[in-house]
Amino acid sequence: MRLERGIDVRKVIDVGMMMLLLLLMAFPFTGQDIHIFLGIIMIAFFIIHHYLNRRWYLSLFKGKKTKIQILFITINSLLLISIFGVALSGLTLAGYVPIMSYFLARKMHLVCSYWSYLLMGLHVGLHLQVTKRIKNQIIVYGIMLIGIILFTKNQILIYLLNMSEFLYVSDRTNMIIYMFEYLMIFILFVLLMNVIIKEMKKK
C-alpha cells in the first residue's frame, strides 16, 4: 500500500514498530506512563500491520508448504501469540482490562515481552536478508558474536525462561547504551535467521 507521493505505508509501519519496540524495552528509563502510551501505539501499529498483510493469512490454506514456508508460519504464529500475551497482560497492569491477577500479569508481561523481542528479530530476519548485502561473512559473524556477548551480559535467558520476576538494570547503564545493546541483540536474531534460511536453501 502506497500513499499518493509513493510512501510505502508498510515500511513506515514496520520502521515505526521497530523504534517503538526498542523504546518499550527501555522501560526502566522511560517510566510507566510513557511505557503505557507507547504500548497502546504499538498495539495500534500491530493491528494495522496485520491488516496490511491480511493476504498472508489467506495463503496459509493454499497448496503444500515448503520447509521455509513452515518456518515462516511457525515464527509468525509464535510471535502473534507472544504479542497477544504482552498486550493482554499490559492492559491488565494498566488497569484497562483487569482479567487476571496483578502478579500473573506482571510475570506474563515480562516473559512475553522478551519472547516477542526475540521472535520479532527472527521475523525481520525472514523478510530482510541482511547477510546478502555484506560480502565479508567475517563481519556477519563478528556482529553476531557481539550480540551473543550482550545477550549474555543482559541475562536475556533468565527472562525468556521465566526465572526472574523483575527486570535488573545496572546503575551504571544509561538509556543510550541500554538501547544500543538491545539493538545489537535484536540484530543477532535477524542475522541468525538469515543464516538458518541460507543453510535451508542449500539442502
What feature does the model see in each segment?
Residues M1-K203:
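Membrane-embedded alpha-helical bundles that constitute the cytochrome b-like, heme-associated redox core
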